[in-house]
Amino acid sequence: MKTICLYFEIHQITHLKRYRFFDIGTDHYYYDDYENDRSINEIAERSYMPALNALQEMIEKNGKYFKVAFSLSGVGMEQLELHAPQVLEKLQQLNNTGCVEFLAEPYSHGLASLVNEASFKDEVMRQCTKIEEYFGKKPTVLRNSSLIYSDDIGNDVANMGFIGMLTEGAKHVLGWKSPHYVYHCALNPKLKLLLRDVNLSDDISLRFSNSDWDGYPLFADNYMNQIAAFPEEEQVINIFMELSALGIAQPLSSNILEFMKALPQCAKDRGITFSTPSEICKKIKSVGEVNVPDTLSWVDEERDVSSWLGNPMQREAFNKLYSVADRVRIANDPRINQDWDYLQASNNFRFMTTKPSNVGLDRGIYSSPFDAFTNYMNILGDFITRVNDLYPTDVDNDQLESLLTTIKNQDEEIEMKDKEIVRLQAKIEKIEKEAEKQHGEKPAKAAPAKKAAAKPAVKKAPAKKAPAKKTTKAEPKEEKKD
């Protein structure tokens, strides 16, 4: 039986402001707050909310039959928290249906997987934590930025404990093979690979409203007929795209949402189901490995990383940024970490591309690739100065890591000692309380025949309940222990 894996990416660009050379060293805030607020509210109104409402309607109408997956970048979630929290609330409502899966991805939507394994792992783990906080479940399948993948990256992902990964079904990688099977990483068979069907995905995300396209207009029944016509043994149809395709790339006036709403019933009529990535990874066996020695992605015709690293400007900016990756990770300064996440976002390098593209590229405030490069390098110059100012630059990374590890261990040891002190203080006060209680009872037993003498002892007993005061003093210490 054929099954469709429908997945949407949600990522929001954090726009950098115009930053001059003379701002270096004086201005440490790099972001265009007005543009960030304007752009995310526009995309939420035109795309995210209408699309998510449509997907919710599809789930409610079709029950457990219809399923969908999402991934959100950490920086995208931060922008949504600030400017469009209703999007996250809607995603939580969708999550409550039990028909939605959330995938892992790098926190920054950056390119760390290409150059720094430790930074890549740290980003993925932080994003998993954030997803779990919002949606109550830790991701088991990973989707890298722009579906970037290679054998080495796949091996790293498998070693992190993920069972599956999404990537591009590029022709130059697959050759005669079909993307409609489950494959596995060539270096680590534990990691299953789900490959995007390029044509079926782009029919919706890129061509749907193009009246010059041979397949225009595209109807849901014809779309499902294409899927049903695949050979019986081709069971997995992976349709991956950005959520902004529904409403931005393909305007709502094109009836894109009506098309989407019709898909579940058309699939059901043809015996085609919907599954989440983890369900497919658990239920369907791999038919073999896919060899990807060189990095691929879902961007541009080449399906590689040349959109971010294709010219000298991009490579210079990339190498300079990641030259301080280990130092940033070791220092672990909150403000530095936040700026690090935003500066890593792959969009910053995409704005510098000189490649022609079939997909329009909005460079925002930048008039040219060189303009984007100059502005970014000014910001990066200030950022690296701040990183180096945290600790002396003559201390190398190994020495710094050793020093900070020692400090961290000492802090943990002090914390343990503090907890032990609180515990012992509480124990001492408990012993004192019991001793005073026993002491208060002794006068009553000493003169049983003389009732008059016994009375003062009885009256004094309440006055001797000093432990009540001590108990109130002990309570803050008990709280400190917790």
PLM features: residue spans?
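Short, well-structured secondary-structure segments
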Residues: 3-8, 14-116, 140-143, 163-168, ...
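An acidic- and aromatic-residue-enriched active-site/binding cleft used to recognize and process polar
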Residues: 9-13, 73-75, 107-110, 136, ...
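Generic structural signal for well-ordered alpha-helices
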Residues: 52-56, 88-92, 121-131, 154, ...
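Acidic, His- and aromatic-enriched active-site or binding-groove loops in soluble protein domains
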Residues: 87-104, 125, 137, 158-179, ...
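CE4/NodB-like, metal-dependent polysaccharide N-deacetylase domain
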Residues: 119-146, 225-240
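Loop-rich catalytic cores of soluble enzymes, especially ATP-dependent carboxylate-amine ligases
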Residues: 163-229
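Intrinsically disordered, polybasic Lys/Arg-rich low-complexity tracts
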Residues: 426, 430-482
